[in-house]
């Protein structure tokens, strides 16, 4: 586990003409048409989008060997002309890439954007005190509504982020560093060097295609490990396709989360517009945030 740095660096705002590099740190690409749609959006905004050497590699279910994926990420990170790194898709693989990995110090950090399995990459940047963006990968970008796209575009150009609104489950107010990610991926990082210190953070989580009992098992692990007793507030995104199998006696995922999170004595806001299967509004991982359990809002400070 690594303590969060006291101060975080935010990459500089992007300018039209800046270079962005596509990397595939996790699973191998399948959705080539969707990838191109995402690239076209970035190019329509005036950015130069280039592809890492191995973005379309295949090694089993991975986008290349661990070393190939490390090398692509490293090359983009060290490229002085590259101002941002766009992850092509999620899947699985970031945990393997992060073995024996350290972010090299550079004069000016750059934006890294992704979600799902990319949670591991975003959390590793926390250790270096660098703000990153939890948000659409290239293969899902074209599914975003106009307001979410403009919110992404504006923030990368230096505009403040508008708050997100959900539904209040537990009242109260909390402020802290925002740590966001996929619940399943995050759970597998507990107890590793990439697990951040959760003391006084706002934890934002989402998931997809996990049965309610599996969500219960993961959240119970967070409770038993003592991590949930440290967080200041919990922001819940979308838990998409998390229904129990037909004919299987079960609670709903909402009932599970309400039961497992309702006695922590901290604000909990649910149904925020981020995650799989719908709007995936960007979240600045590592930035300061405020969770208002009375108003049902997540704001960025």
Swiss-Prot record:
Active site positions, chain numbering: 116 (nucleophile), 206 (charge relay system), 276 (charge relay system)
Report if keyword Membrane is assigned: no
Which GO BP annotation is one of this protein's? proteolysis
Q: What class of enzyme is it?
A: hydrolase
Protease listed as a keyword: yes
One GO cellular component this record assigns the protein to is: cytosol
Question: This protein's superkingdom?
Answer: Bacteria
Q: Which UniProt keywords apply?
A: Carboxypeptidase, Hydrolase, Protease, Serine protease
What InterPro entries does UniProt report for this protein, alphabetically?
Carboxypeptidase_A_C_sf, Class_I_gatase-like, LdcA_N, Peptidase_S66_N, Peptidase_S66C, S66_fam
As one GO molecular function, the record gives: carboxypeptidase activity
EC annotation from Swiss-Prot or TrEMBL: 3.4.16.-
Which PANTHER family does the UniProt entry name for this protein?
MURAMOYLTETRAPEPTIDE CARBOXYPEPTIDASE, MUREIN TETRAPEPTIDE CARBOXYPEPTIDASE
Name recorded for this polypeptide: Putative carboxypeptidase slr1534
Q: Which organism is it from?
A: Synechocystis sp. (strain ATCC 27184 / PCC 6803 / Kazusa)
